[in-house]
Design a protein with these regions (language model features):
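Ubiquitin-like/PB1-type beta-grasp interaction modules and other compact soluble beta-rich domains
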Residues: 1-80
Length: 81
């Protein structure tokens, strides 16, 4: 199992109660599940609308294997223009 730094932005940071933490998992899905378990339903609801980046690249598959020491960014939709 690897550890990854997960960074939350905007509404995701508010729902998690932090803007960064280190969580363990083998895949992006496992890390996000650990985050949901740690922070509850509010974060789970926000994650449904978020984009997720692993090592700076968009992830659309929760089975993506994380690289040791990787960063996972959780980005809610942004409004404005």
């Amino acid at each position: 199992m690897s550890a990854a730094t997960i960074r939350y932005f905007a509404g995701a940071a508010e729902a998690a109660g932090t803007d960064e933490e280190v969580l363990e998992g083998t895949t992006v899905g496992e890390v996000l599940a650990a985050a949901q378990q740690a922070h509850g339903d509010r974060l789970s609801e926000v994650l449904e609308r978020c984009s997720v980046l692993h090592a700076g690249r968009y992830v659309d598959d929760d089975t993506t294997v994380i690289t040791p020491g990787a960063t996972i960014d959780v980005l809610p939709p942004f409004a404005g223009g």
